[in-house]
Curated annotation (Swiss-Prot):
Keyword set, alphabetical order: ATP-binding, Cell cycle, Cell division, DNA damage, DNA recombination, DNA repair, DNA replication, Ligase, Magnesium, Metal-binding, Nucleotide-binding
The protein's required cofactors: Mg(2+)
HAMAP family per UniProt: DNA_ligase
Name of the protein this chain belongs to: DNA ligase
Gene (name only): lig
Organism of this sequence: Pyrococcus horikoshii (strain ATCC 700860 / DSM 12428 / JCM 9974 / NBRC 100139 / OT-3)
Amino acid sequence: MKYIELAQLYQKLEKTTMKLIKTRLVADFLKRVPEDHLDFIPYLILGDVFPEWDERELGVGEKLLIKAVSMATGVDPKEIENSVKDTGDLGESIALAIKRRKQKSFFSQPLTIKRVYQTLVKIAETTGEGSQEKKMKYLANLFMDAEPLEAKYLARTVLGTMRTGVAEGLLRDAIALAFHVKVELVERAYMLTSDFGFVAKIAKAEGNEGLEKVTIQLGKPIKPMLAQQAANIKEALLEMGGEAEFEIKYDGARVQVHKDGEKVIIYSRRLENVTRAIPEIVEAIKEAIEPEKVIVEGELVAIGEEGRPLPFQYVLRRFRRKHNIEEMMKKIPLELNLFDVLYVDGKSFVDTKFIERRKKLEEIVKPNGKIKVAENLITKNAEEAEKFYKRALEMGHEGLMAKRLDAVYEPGNRGKKWLKIKPTMENLDLVIIGAEWGEGRRAHLFGSFILGAYDPETGEFLEVGKVGSGFTDDDLVEFTKMLKPLIVKEEGKRVVIQPKIVIEVTYQEIQKSPKYRSGFALRFPRYVALRDDKGPEDADTIERIAQLYELQERIKGKV
């Protein structure tokens, strides 16, 4: 299958904002895809190369990409860089450079999707001495044979800046439409495997019957079940039917552990492989968990000198560390508090009641210094739960989780079967979708940032406010440096930013607002932290903001 066909799809997707049209375009394309291409083409359509849980990265920045194009075309790198000032898009500028190419090689052949994909895999797997030079040559070979339109979208794929408006929800619907299968079965299969390529192949080859049989696969992370927030203990008990399991809500980073004999893989909430960053937890898991094949979930907490929990940002520092890991192990010791089990020796526990999963977890885990089972209380008594809540807060934890005893595990769902109970309203994780230049001595820096909430159905990020407080001067320097390469266009003092960076904000309240398409605005938002453990699709959604607004109004009504 020729790459120009995929490039033409990207072009059509970029030209329409209509979700139904985009879905039909992707579905029609998928129908024509050969079966042996289906395991990777869904990722290329999303603008990626690999699933989010795959460790491989291309490791190609703008400068290396421009050098590769220069090698392929003979156009000076500075000319390509200067062109971006006019086009506002490196992909467009590279397409122009390809048009200026003197001539194609005598041995030139049309690009195929398979060749492009295999070359990108080769680039990701090229490491060590001289790797940058090799990557540049691999890319140059592709650009030598590329048409301008192909070059534009190949460049965007390499940089991860596709911008065609195709998100997970749209791809899910397109797979269902293309292969005449139920959308809820595509959704379920994807939530269990986090692998659109695998799901698309099953949908085409085996239809609804095949999708119904899809189950957990060791080594492929399951989308985590999420919780809403309750106003208080009484509301949580009422929602749970009068009795619930309460467990400590730790201020850490959620992880999913896959153990297959001596092999252990640990995924973050974002489903990134963080195994190498936390070797002591890997070893502790091998000692603490007896069965050979297991998937468990827990909260990874950083522990301070007096044994009290440190803020979750300390865990993120451990995740980010690539070198001197042993030194970081001493500086920031970790503890894993397990709270769920999803798979044991060939049996899935996803459709098992929570109370039975909890018992199984306690059966298979032998706590040690690094691995514990989350402390819990099963009760019908609100006063007893209040005492447990108070003790959790005194110990330095965030609050409690309330879990319905008969609840099955619902991958990717944020329902009311799990509820958070915290003393404050939940902070929000939002995406920076724009920025405004500062004034005076800060005129060369961004001074405030436009916040967007995610709409998973359309893949859009809808504005919910602007944040300018909570940043230090150093923060503004860092954010300006981080966001400048992501500028899509400038409109006076305001710039439109490609949605890539997630930040955590606090706020005084959520208000309904006709000013924004989202329908909501944050009153007095304040920056708390950079959430580089989350991708834009992991940001809080419009639906989540609506839920928090309702919770806020309920709390007001009870004051």
